[in-house]
Amino acid sequence: MIDLYHHGSSVCAAKVRFALGEKGVAWEGHYLDIHKGDQFEPEYLKLNPKAVVPTLVHNGRVIPESTVINEYLDEVFPEVPLKPNDPQARAAMRVWTKAVDEVLHPACAEVTFSACLRHRVKRLPPKEYEKFLASTPSQSVTPQWRERRRDLVTLGFDTPGLGEQYRLYDSYLDKMEKSLAHQLWLAGDTFSLADIAMTPYVNRLDMLGWGQMWEQTRPQVTAWFERIKARPTFKPALLDWCPPDLTAELLTFGRQSWPSVERLLSQAS
């Protein structure tokens, strides 16, 4: 029995839903509205003290961290392998998944909050607004995430250091373009956990209406993303769980934010 605690817009939860879909493994979902603070409820904090999603429970065993979850799923359900056979390709796969966890995910959090989610948080009633910001554990997405998220919500695109995060995000599209120039998928010629790991982060840019970051200048990334979107598991895992109002707001606020994004991307680091 697999239970997955998740949210529709969480890139990390999407990674796990994508892997479960590719594996063809049935699961029971427990939906947490992370924008209303469901992840701070005491019962969930017992499962995940970081107050983040996803958390997977398999036969009573609690497994946090999306990359760890996906590696676990690939070992427990080996019928549809998501790791390359070649050791060098497996190493390349893990370079991608490690980079996602350590570098790209924190950047994605800052990008998403500055461009869109801060507007949702600012609409909360004053008591809920303060409770939401105060309930965030400091050791969450990054060290001092509680303080950083407050800055992102209140300062938006004027948050100090935000441009570095946008340019870092953009640099990973360059890394993808280079890697895909000589192979079909990120870790070689077979679809793997590397592609699953990167998909939600490219899709996040797409949902913000920023496809121009690759469509005209990065043909390999463009072709890769088209192959990804053609997979039957993509839409159920990446799109269908996102609440329609949030999907609409990501696109609306993303498009409104694009001039600010262009400005940050054009600045020297």
Task: List PLM regions with ranges.
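A generic structural-conservation signal
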Residues: 29, 53, 189, 214, ...
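Long, positively charged, glycine-interspersed low-complexity recognition regions
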Residues: 215-269
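Generic structural signal for individual residues within well-ordered alpha-helical segments
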Residues: 45, 91-94, 197, 222, ...
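GST-like domain detector, emphasizing the conserved glutathione-binding G-site
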Residues: 1-143, 253-255, 261-269
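GST-like fold's C-terminal all-alpha helical module
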Residues: 106-226, 230
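Positions that flank functional sites
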Residues: 34-35, 191, 243-244
